[in-house]
């Protein structure tokens, strides 16, 4: 194999890399990790081009910076921070390709572009890829406790960047905002009333999203992989530990 597992990723081998679980499907179900970024990016660019003259919604999920971290040869060894750094470079290229497509088609000013993550950072996530050894002083969690899978702040604080030249002035927004509130906020932006029972946990935070509200939402509820709950209100974060839980299995 070309990438050895550290824990849990030791089942079906595809593209020379052992995976989580067992997979079947024959040749048509196989893939090459090094090409995933190019394939997804090209499909997204083609979709945008095909729908440039009409309203469209595109959700684009990338493989980067998730494991297994296998960058295209264009990026392999270029960061000086190992494969984790290399796939971050690859992700940066992907974002640039999408933004360039919007610019070249002349629709960037009236397109809402959102970049975000689904969880906080994780370094060793199942493969012996030297991600931790090659951080070179970088601290992805900063000073926060926890990380991916955790209900602590480093597990749920994520990058959230919005570009919409016609609607949002460039700047930084420090007001708290939850991904759950994107649904109701976009509905408000589109003047689309939500029927009873639709996205009941989502709150309209449009002014926060647009950067005109400095207060933000009153509270944010967080949940980890083991269903441990925490709540953030102002400068206070409370995590509720159940009787059988310890600090070790929350981090």
Feature map (PLM): residue ranges:
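Catalytic-site neighborhoods of secreted/periplasmic enzymes
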Residues: 1-29, 221
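Short glycine/proline-rich turn/loop motifs
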Residues: 18-29, 73-78, 163-167
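Substrate-binding rim/cap in mid-to-C-terminal beta-strand-loop elements of soluble/periplasmic
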Residues: 24, 96-105, 133-199, 203-214
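Active-site His/acidic residue clusters
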Residues: 39, 44-87, 122-124, 128-129
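Loop/turn elements at helix/coil->beta-strand transitions in domains of secreted/extracellular proteins
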Residues: 52-58, 107-113, 216-217, 234-236
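Short, solvent-exposed turn/loop segments enriched in Gly/Ser/Thr/Pro and often Arg
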Residues: 59-68, 115-123, 201-202, 221-226
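Metal-dependent active-site segment of extracytoplasmic phospho-/sulfohydrolases and closely related
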Residues: 90-128
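Conserved small/polar residues in nucleotide/adenosyl-binding loops
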Residues: 239-246
